[in-house]
Amino acid sequence: MNIFTLSFAKAKSLDESRFCVVSIARFVPRGFKGVRCYSLAPSRELLHDYKSGLSESSYKVRYLKELGDSVHIHEVFESLVPFCKGRDLVLCCYESDGKFCHRHLLSDRVFQLFGYRINELSC
């Protein structure tokens, strides 16, 4: 099983027989049929503060603190495996490619802790 990231907008066109789409956002788009993983989403408070002017560097510090330690992150990913049923895992949120986004912070953290690179899915 491979793990990728992608925006919700691009995930709409994915083949569900090949990809297990998982929301790592606090809220999902209307009609979203994938798995919701609130454990990897930023808190409501963090989202509110960011929309109210919190800097990207402060957001990063707070989001990584919310994510927790390597044991917690590993347990969250392990809990997603049964939903995938052999398909590749795609972690989704709203931000488009190239924008500051928590899914990229998560990817960097996973690489830092486990040496596993999570890339943006090309589609």
Q: Where in this protein do the model-derived segments appear?
A:
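Residues lining hydrophobic/aromatic ligand-binding pockets adjacent to catalytic sites
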Residues: 1-123
